[in-house]
Structure formats: C-alpha cells, structure tokens
Amino acid sequence: MALRIIFMGTPDFAVPILNSIINSQHRLLAIYTQNPKKSDRGQKINISPVHYFAKEKKIEVRSPKDLNLEEKIFIQKLNPDIIVVAAYGKIIPPEFLKIKNTKFINIHASLLPKWRGAAPIQRS
C-alpha cells in the first residue's frame, strides 16, 4: 500500500531521504523547507539544499515563515498518512501533531539523546 507523505527538511542531510521518498512507490504530497535566507556580504538570497533539489526535480516547495493555522489547514486537506521530518529546523507545533489520521516520524542525524542539538553530526 502506497503511503501519502509530506516531507519536511532543510540541509544536505535531508536530501537523500527526500530522494528515497521520491523514488519509492509512495506518493509525495508536499515538501516543506526553511524559507530562503540572505547571506554573505552581498546579501545574496540562498535557498536550502532541499529547496534546490526539489527545484531540480520540478517539485513545488512550501517554505512558510511559520507553521501557522493556514499551513495546518493546508496539511489537513492533503490528508497525509505520514509526515517525515529530517532536520527541518523549526519546531512542529503540538496542534500539528494532533492532525487526525496523520503520524509523524523524525529522522535524526545522530543517536538521541546523547548527540541532540543543532549540530549533532559535528559533535558525534
């Protein structure tokens, strides 16, 4: 049975996970990533590795400033079976975790709780 999946991720670590979902028999409903950020002296706008990868695959990306009521309603309408989170970089609000018939799975880059935090790969 194919699952209906929403993916939430941002850095390089998340790209192979997203690619695995795309290449599976499951149905990818949406991709969420952090919004583009200004960096460097020229204040160039940089998109996340997940956004760049999705753009290459011609898949639309959602990058809201906040996971608010509008996003919750959008997700509810998609009716996913599962939401896969891989280093998204935002805290998922508790009310999202209660969306009916939707489960969440978090893929972490290191062993928890020993290597928790913002830079688990570097610390491990």
In which residue ranges do the predicted regions lie?
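One-carbon transfer enzymes
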Residues: M1-S124
